[in-house]
């Protein structure tokens, strides 16, 4: 007996590989002209929430939100209302901040694991 599949489910490769010639990020200005709306392909709630949280803590941002327009598409939209700053620069700066935080977290984790292994290796020799 075969397992039924969703007829509208995209192919796995379409969720992981950006087609040739397509842009990863597109920027639009909202109808009112006060917000930047960034459409980011091949991303989901994981990165959307991280970026939104970082933007919400940025004093140069009045408003930040994200949404995933459709659950079967790996596309998110991030909306930023900047306080007189370029939205593209704010997004870029906040993504770099997140990358630095993740890098620091990774280094700390690797160091702690190494210390744990060294400590247990010493105890194992007794």
UniProtKB/Swiss-Prot annotation:
CDD domains: RNAP_II_RPB11 (cd06926). It is found in: Nucleus. GO terms for molecular function: DNA binding; DNA-directed RNA polymerase activity; protein dimerization activity. The keyword Signal does not apply. GO terms for biological process: transcription by RNA polymerase II. SUPFAM superfamilies: RBP11-like subunits of RNA polymerase. Keywords: DNA-directed RNA polymerase, Nucleus, Transcription. GO terms for cellular component: RNA polymerase II, core complex. The keyword Transcription applies. Coiled coil: none annotated. InterPro entries: RBP11, RBP11-like, RBP11-like_dimer, RNA_pol_Rpb11_13-16kDa_CS, Rpo11-like. Component of the RNA polymerase II (Pol II) complex consisting of 12 subunits. PANTHER family: DNA-DIRECTED RNA POLYMERASE I,II,III (PTHR13946), DNA-DIRECTED RNA POLYMERASE II SUBUNIT RPB11 (PTHR13946:SF16). Belongs to the archaeal Rpo11/eukaryotic RPB11/RPC19 RNA polymerase subunit family. DNA-dependent RNA polymerase catalyzes the transcription of DNA into RNA using the four ribonucleoside triphosphates as substrates. Component of RNA polymerase II which synthesizes mRNA precursors and many functional non-coding RNAs. Pol II is the central component of the basal RNA polymerase II transcription machinery. It is composed of mobile elements that move relative to each other. RPB11 is part of the core element with the central large cleft. This is Probable DNA-directed RNA polymerase II subunit RPB11. It comes from Plasmodium berghei (strain Anka). The lineage of its organism: Eukaryota, Sar, Alveolata, Apicomplexa, Aconoidasida. The gene is RPB11.
């Amino acid at each position: 007996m075969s397992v039924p599949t969703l007829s509208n489910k995209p192919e796995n490769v379409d969720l992981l590989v950006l087609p040739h010639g397509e842009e990863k990020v597109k920027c639009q200005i909202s109808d009112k002209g006060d917000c930047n709306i960034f459409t980011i392909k091949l991303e989901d709630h994981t990165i959307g929430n991280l970026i939104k949280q970082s933007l919400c803590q940025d004093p140069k941002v009045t408003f930040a939100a994200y949404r995933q327009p459709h659950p079967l598409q790996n596309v998110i939209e991030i909306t930023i209302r900047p306080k007189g700053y370029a939205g593209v620069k704010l997004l870029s700066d906040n993504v770099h901040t997140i990358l630095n935080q993740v890098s620091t977290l990774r280094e700390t984790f690797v160091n702690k694991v190494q210390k744990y292994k060294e400590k247990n290796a010493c105890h194992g020799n007794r």
